[in-house]
Amino acid sequence: MSLLSIITIGLAGLGGLVNGQRDLSVELGVASNFAILAKAGISSVPDSAILGDIGVSPAAATYITGFGLTQDSSTTYATSPQVTGLIYAADYSTPTPNYLAAAVANAETAYNQAAGFVDPDFLELGAGELRDQTLVPGLYKWTSSVSVPTDLTFEGNGDATWVFQIAGGLSLADGVAFTLAGGANSTNIAFQVGDDVTVGKGAHFEGVLLAKRFVTLQTGSSLNGRVLSQTEVALQKATVNSPFVPAPEVVQKRSNARQWL
């Protein structure tokens, strides 16, 4: 084999790497505009605090409870003292239904993309119990549920990516904290979870939750990232901070939906 052939094969083997690391980026599409997006409903035990937009589809606005909604005169969105952002529902006026349908479809595509990565770097780590771990970038896979009884650290540079494929549920114990180190970015950490997700009282979560089922953020818990659920999301005096906070002119463009569809 010639030296050129060896070099060519070596370069081909680097495909999909970012700064020498495997690229596991998950594309959220229009769903990236939301702090919380759910198909069946979003509830709050007041007062919760959400930085970013929230939306439900195909559910109607009556399935957004505990927020004290005030609908805008355009009837395309609503507001709430608990939400620094806009609130969308499938029964609001055009073009909101199409905007939400696109976001939900993109969230489902992202879930499937995350579930579709192969050749995990870590399989059944800790037999489903993550205790006092520092997690390096890579693909993690479990065929059952995962519990987190103690703090976790995600260590990697700003381009590093993590994907966690969890066939069962995910639960964080009360007071557990996810910590980022080395420049790690919460938008590059994706959890694809096939069953219910529970973030315990006072616990802190970092990353994007791609959840097949119910997500509960218990009293005093917080999440830096996004919650994209294919069923419902329940907040109990919880905090969600999204990396995307629209400027006023972007809000207006999004209301018109021309920018997104």
UniProtKB/Swiss-Prot annotation:
It comes from Leucosporidium sp. (strain AY30). Changing S43Y: Has 35% thermal hysteresis (TH) activity of that of the wild-type. GO terms for cellular component: extracellular region. Belongs to the ice-binding protein family. InterPro entries: Ice-bd_prot (IPR021884). It is found in: Secreted. Keywords: Antifreeze protein, Glycoprotein, Secreted, Signal, Stress response. This is Ice-binding protein. Glycans are attached at N185. Changing S171Y: Has 67% thermal hysteresis (TH) activity of that of the wild-type. Its main location: secreted. Confers freeze tolerance. Binds to the surface of ice crystals and inhibits their growth. Has low thermal hysteresis (TH) activity, which is the ability to lower the freezing point of an aqueous solution below its melting point. The TH activity of this protein is approximately 0.2 degrees Celsius at 50 uM and 0.3 degrees Celsius at 400 uM. It holds the Pfam family Ice_binding. The record marks T65, S147, A234 as: Ice-binding. Glycosylated. Glycosylation is not required for the thermal hysteresis (TH) activity. Glycosylation may increase stability and secretion of this protein. GO terms for molecular function: ice binding. Homodimer. Dimerization is not required for the thermal hysteresis (TH) activity. The lineage of its organism: Eukaryota, Fungi, Dikarya, Basidiomycota, Pucciniomycotina.
